[in-house]
């Protein structure tokens, strides 16, 4: 699954701007995901805990713990 999602992209609107996530690393053994986050022109790479529910794998983003589902990421060509 690691290479399947490499650099796949997802965008979310936070009420003011679009935030873009790109998967850099997905480690099921450690239950971690590293994503490059582009937020208002600033790019950061952050590692989050990876969770699983009935809809698949996800991580929680921001102070409101927004659920970001891995299956929502799309390959950019």
Residue ranges and their predicted role:
Residues 13-70:
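Acidic, low-complexity, intrinsically disordered interaction modules
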Residues 1-4, 74-77:
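Short intrinsically disordered terminal tails
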Residues 4-15:
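Short aromatic-glycine-(Arg/Gly/Cys) micro-motifs in beta-strand/loop hairpins
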């Amino acid at each position: 699954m690691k290479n399947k999602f490499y650099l796949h992209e997802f965008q979310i609107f936070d009420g003011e701007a679009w935030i873009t996530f790109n998967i850099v690393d997905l480690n099921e053994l450690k239950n971690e995901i590293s994503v490059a986050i582009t937020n208002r022109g600033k790019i950061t790479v952050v590692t989050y805990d990876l969770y699983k529910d009935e809809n698949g794998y996800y991580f929680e983003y921001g102070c409101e713990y927004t659920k970001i589902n891995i299956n929502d990421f799309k390959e950019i060509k």
